[in-house]
Amino acid sequence: PANTMRLATESADDQQKLAVLLDALGAQVEEGDRPSEQALCLIAPYGDDATTAANRFGVDAARTVCVDLLTDLSRHRTLMMTPATRPDMRAAAHALFARDGVGVTVIRDSVGFVAQRVLAMVVNLACDIAQQRIASPEDIDQAVRLGLGYPQGPLAWGDSLGPRRLLTILERMLNVTGDPRYRPSHWLRRRALLGLSLRLDEPSTI
């Protein structure tokens, strides 16, 4: 059971990314429409908590562990359980992802893991500042990069993470919790839907 996985991801790219890592770790990934009774159900959701993700993908919550694909898996891995996840499934997932010496954190059920929630909210706040015309996109990124020592500004960071992906994270967190803190800014929503850069300023009306 520790080496048999059933994957559920948001995209073909995510499926391939996770499959390559699991192959390197020595896990066997099952094919077919339904997981076998002994398989660990590994889900890589954006924005959802593990319970919602297990329900959406139609897998057994007792055998479900979620993994965050938003961040660099070569540096750290975050796993999330449902309230029903069996201890042996949690232990199997942790042992597998720690097999190559990379650090693994296991968290309880929560919308957006940790990194997804923090990064989406930081980018969304920067988008809201741009929408309010407090500063230009370039100035927002420069202020954060130079003032806080970030490697890149939040809008550039949002572009690298994917505006559409961040929109999905925020919308799902808002849907599950009802918390208005997760409401996507108009700046983010419009650019995500149009496939535009978050650093693209509004056109002049003159």
State where each predicted segment sits:
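NAD(P)-dependent Rossmann-like dehydrogenase/reductase catalytic/cofactor-binding core
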Residues: 1-206
